[in-house]
Amino acid sequence: MGFFDRFQRKKPLTEAQKRWNKLWFLWFKGGIESPYEELMTYQSEVTNGGHGQYFINTLLWKTHMQTLHTILPDILWENLQAACDAFEAEDDETLAECDTMFDRNQHLVAEILQAHADTLAL
């Protein structure tokens, strides 16, 4: 073992981290059930480029709205509705405010997803 090898050692993943990784792997492969698939798509798109990116990249976003309503906490559901209205009205300022509101509350989505990940078998 060389000198620098000791800096490359990684701690083994915890069971929770393994389940989290499995959740995202299943989503990537299209093997995650509704409503988690829609929630993960929403979170991924909004986190990477805002609500505008979500609406542009997700062709079925209008269909996903009903599903997201069943799983999103009220504060995020109301924010998504406001973002939808802003997107359709081409109101970039309000859309940016909705992105900020999502950023402040995305821990709520992470908690929902982690709770689901915790149910996955390894």
Where are these regions (language model features)?
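Extended, alpha-helix-rich binding/interface surfaces that flank or overlap catalytic cores
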Residues: 3-122
